[in-house]
Amino acid sequence: MSRALLTLVQWLSPAFPTGAFAYSHGLEWAIAEGEVQDAAGVEQWVADILRFGSGRTDAILLAHALKGHDLEALSDLARALAPSAERLRETEEQGAAFAATTAALTGRALPPRPLPVAIGQAAAALGRPVTEVLELTLHAFAANLVSAAVRFVPLGQTEGQAILSSLHPLIEEIARESAEAPIEAIGSAAVRGDLAAMRHETQQVRIFKT
């Protein structure tokens, strides 16, 4: 394994201080309301977010950031695509934390940006294949949602790992498609996920920020 790949794995690990564990992407509301009740429901919910929601959207944004496209324009687009105040907060807060930590580690000037653009601006210097960066980023995103479900449904740890394993083919597929997708291909149809994120904003009892 190359040092660049090890660095990327470090940046996308749960130990990296982005605070990802505090965000459920609206999943907490879906669980609390009974829309997601078991392992099968969690797997379907996360798969839909990856395929039809912010998973694919962020992957395309990340791919363009990795290729050195206009980072300011990509950041503006990422903010505009956030379907709720909490989703915007989620991508901006994690992106700022990611940029600050990678800047401290690398000595580079890395301004705060929405998360997929922040990852792209930092990871571009590693020289890793675009598809590989997308796969690892999507995996980290899916793993965080599964971890939230393990804590809140609750599920067993083995059930959670089985869900994540079952999502690997989908992650590979989305990464391949997104690596070459034009920016015009961005679009979302994860309506239930977006509504869950909106409704979480007024959820009175919560353990996650989003």
Swiss-Prot record:
Keyword Metal-binding found: no
* Coiled-coil stretches noted in the UniProt entry, renumbered to this chain: none
Location, primary (coarse class): cytoplasm
User: What highest taxon heads this organism's lineage?
Assistant: Bacteria
Q: Which Pfam families match?
A: UreF (PF01730)
Family to which this protein belongs:
Belongs to the UreF family.
PANTHER family, alphabetized? UREASE ACCESSORY PROTEIN F (PTHR33620:SF1)
Query: HAMAP family, alphabetically?
Result: UreF (MF_01385)
Assembly and binders? UreD, UreF and UreG form a complex that acts as a GTP-hydrolysis-dependent molecular chaperone, activating the urease apoprotein by helping to assemble the nickel containing metallocenter of UreC. The UreE protein probably delivers the nickel.
What's this chain's function? Required for maturation of urease via the functional incorporation of the urease nickel metallocenter.
**What is the name listed in the Swiss-Prot or TrEMBL entry for this protein?**
Urease accessory protein UreF
